[in-house]
Amino acid sequence: MRLLCIGDVCGSLGCEKVRRVLPTLKRQEKIDVVIINGENSADNNGVTPFSADYLFACGADVITGGNHSFRNEEIRSYLDDNQFILRPSNLPEETNGRGYCLLDMGRYSVAVINLVGTIYLERLKASNPFLAADELIEKAENDGADIIVVDFHAEATSEKRALGFYLDGRVSAFFGTHTHIQTADNKILPKGTGYITDLGMTGVENSVLGVKTEIIINRLKSGDMSKFLQAEGECTLNGCIFEIDLAPRKTVETKRILI
């Protein structure tokens, strides 16, 4: 099974990049399942029903989220109604939506788990991602999942690597999101889990994490707190492909994507 995971899609330009690139990429790489992190897919940050529907129409099987998932209030009922758009599972219990889904692909099923880190993201009041992962992996196994995939939306590289090694051999693929910078460490961990610390982003290349460069420069240089605005220009799509052997449920190859 070939799994394509696409990094944080930024605004309408990022969505448009997915629309233009994904069909050809799926065909050329013989992709079976597509997971897209869409927590920044709306132009004003966050995700909306419109941007989620757009990504599903482009070919996403599952959309994952993160710390910006609830930036737009209208997404709350959408998260409750659509089981294939996720928000981090370890957010407080009263949070709308879910952080786990089971995708039925016919001859196999894929469980997708979405978690958020706790380092530098304390305001989210998220529970321990290690313990949450334990619970959700047990649920996936009880549900008969053939493959388990984790999107860990986290700030700290150390937290991502630690959870990746903790889950090695228990999940088929583990990828990080959130930083918008693709890491060059895609690998297969010792017990067979495909891993990358961060997928990167799908957004404007000449930007600061998808935001207009002058806004970020002015904030860092002089403390100007102007509103973040999406950058304009040519976009790149970042992601990673995991080829997973269904019998041992382990990754046999990883390939970074930068288009």
Give residue spans per PLM region:
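Acidic, metal/ion-coordinating pockets
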Residues: 1-259
